[in-house]
């Protein structure tokens, strides 16, 4: 990821985010369309920043809930078989275990959220199952 992209993110979200941008999200890049940044904040809590048009693949969290606290920009969240929900700073999404979903930025906006992994009580193993990319045509229809 080049300096220009990082500078764009800082300029676009700098005033609206109290959290660090983090580093290029290379560890999970194969599960994303576009570039993202990851800033671990504490055990199971991270700030994730998406460039315009960036989104993660459909995926499922096994053995844990995921809570997204939107902190800047404009993005999308969608559960399999449901319409996409537009997200803005202040929105909170509570994703139950075993729910197939994706989330990411709008086409024309940087987007950032805090992702919180919450293990299910009594469940010893947590994992993410990464699935197919979000269909470009369907994503392109989002306003």
PLM feature spans:
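A short, N-terminal "cap"/entry segment at the start of jelly-roll beta-barrel domains
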Residues: 1-44, 128-143
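Short hydrophobic/aromatic-rich beta-strand segments that constitute the beta-sheet cores
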Residues: 39-40, 77, 113
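Conserved metal-binding segment of the jelly-roll/cupin
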Residues: 50-53, 87-108, 118
């Amino acid at each position: 990821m080049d300096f220009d992209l990082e500078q764009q993110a800082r300029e676009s979200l700098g005033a609206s985010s109290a959290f660090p941008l983090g580093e290029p999200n290379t560890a999970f890049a194969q599960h994303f369309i576009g570039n993202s940044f990851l800033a671990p904040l504490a055990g199971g809590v991270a700030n994730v920043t998406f460039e315009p048009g960036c989104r993660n693949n459909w995926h499922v969290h096994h053995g844990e809930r995921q809570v997204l606290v939107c902190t800047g920009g404009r993005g999308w969240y969608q559960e399999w078989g449901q319409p996409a929900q537009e997200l803005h700073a202040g929105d909170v999404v509570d994703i139950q275990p075993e729910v197939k979903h994706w989330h990411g930025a709008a086409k024309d906006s940087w987007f950032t959220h805090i992702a919180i992994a919450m293990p299910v009580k009594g469940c010893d193993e947590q994992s993410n199952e990464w699935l197919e990319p979000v269909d470009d045509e369907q994503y392109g229809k989002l306003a």
